[in-house]
UniProtKB/Swiss-Prot annotation:
Any Pfam family matching the protein: EF_TS
A GO MF label: translation elongation factor activity
HAMAP family: EF_Ts
Protein name as it appears in the record: Elongation factor Ts
PANTHER family per record: ELONGATION FACTOR TS (PTHR11741), ELONGATION FACTOR TS, MITOCHONDRIAL (PTHR11741:SF0)
Originating species: Streptomyces ramocissimus
Family designation: Belongs to the EF-Ts family.
Main function: Associates with the EF-Tu.GDP complex and induces the exchange of GDP to GTP. It remains bound to the aminoacyl-tRNA.EF-Tu.GTP complex up to the GTP hydrolysis stage on the ribosome.
Protein localization: Cytoplasm
Alphabetically ordered keywords of this record: Cytoplasm, Elongation factor, Protein biosynthesis
Region (Involved in Mg(2+) ion dislocation from EF-Tu): 82-85
């Protein structure tokens, strides 16, 4: 007969992030002693890190850190395997610690971030590996963003109320305007534009869209004399869908995002949108 309760299993899962069967087995071996079970799972976790390398990490959280004066901001995406771990305090603390480190260290890229020391003698990569072992799941840090050249604001969106934010948006204006920054960030979260303006779309992307539009138009049997005009209309439609400034503003679709910015007298310098797993 088991010498532990369902509450012990729940507590052990909360402490370690391990699966239910692993927790029951650890409690069996520890004769119901939760502290010994935690130690056993941590040891097992260290041995199991390599085994988890091939597993998929598509859950997780996006975390933001914004300076008190809005002069800089950070987004960090940390991924895990299950929503159970994602909504746990331990996982979210790891993600927040990394975001705080990014805000202070300002690494140039992901490689620099992973190689930097988050604690004395411990790199971010080692910190992530430790979380991997402690939580019993594959933990992946592969994306972050940092703005520090204007008025920066973040908008975080939860796709489920019991999960941490799955979508994070960072916007940078040339001057302070919290209302416009928040509204535009909400728009970006909802509509996921790929580019800021037409000028930001690479020529090869435009050429590809133009080619697809022409082939589609010809396949539809449109008159030769009308093809050029139809193709141009479809390419312009692509720009409207893919570029932020030309989109109808989510909070007032009678205006474009560009119009909203112009009326407020601000310029959107850049933005980024991170969605967990995408």
């Amino acid at each position: 007969m088991a010498n532990y309760t369902a509450a012990d299993v729940k507590k052990l899962r909360e402490l370690t992030g391990a699966g239910m069967m692993d927790c029951k087995k650890a409690l069996d071996e520890a004769e119901g002693n939760v502290e010994k079970a935690v130690e056993a799972l941590r040891i097992k976790g260290q041995k199991g890190v390599a085994k988890r390398e091939g597993r998929s990490a598509e859950n997780g959280a996006v975390v933001s850190i914004i300076a008190d004066d809005n002069s800089s901001g950070v987004l960090v995406e940390l991924k895990c395997e299950t929503d159970f771990v994602a909504k746990g305090e331990k996982f979210q603390n790891v993600a927040t610690a990394i975001a705080e480190h990014v805000a202070k260290a300002a690494p140039a890229d992901l490689d620099a971030l992973l190689a930097s020391e988050i604690e004395a003698g411990k790199t971010v990569q080692a910190f992530v590996d430790e979380a991997n072992a402690n939580l019993g799941e594959k933990i992946v840090l592969d994306r972050f963003a940092q703005f520090a050249d204007g008025y920066v604001l973040a908008y975080m969106h939860r796709t489920m109320p019991d999960l941490p934010p799955q979508i994070g948006v960072l916007v940078e204006l040339d001057k302070p305007n919290a209302e416009v920054a928040k509204g535009v960030a909400q728009h970006i979260a909802a509509f996921a534009p790929k580019y800021l303006s037409k000028e930001d779309v690479r020529p090869d992307v435009v050429e590809s869209e133009r080619r697809i539009a022409e082939e589609t138009t010809r396949a539809e049997g449109k008159p030769e004399a009308a093809i050029a005009k139809i193709v141009e209309g479809r390419v312009n439609g692509f720009f409207k869908d893919a570029t932020l400034l030309g989109q109808p503003y989510a909070l007032d679709n009678k205006k474009s995002v560009q119009k909203v910015l112009d009326e407020a007298g601000v310029t959107l310098k850049r933005f980024t949108r991170i969605k967990v797993g995408i």
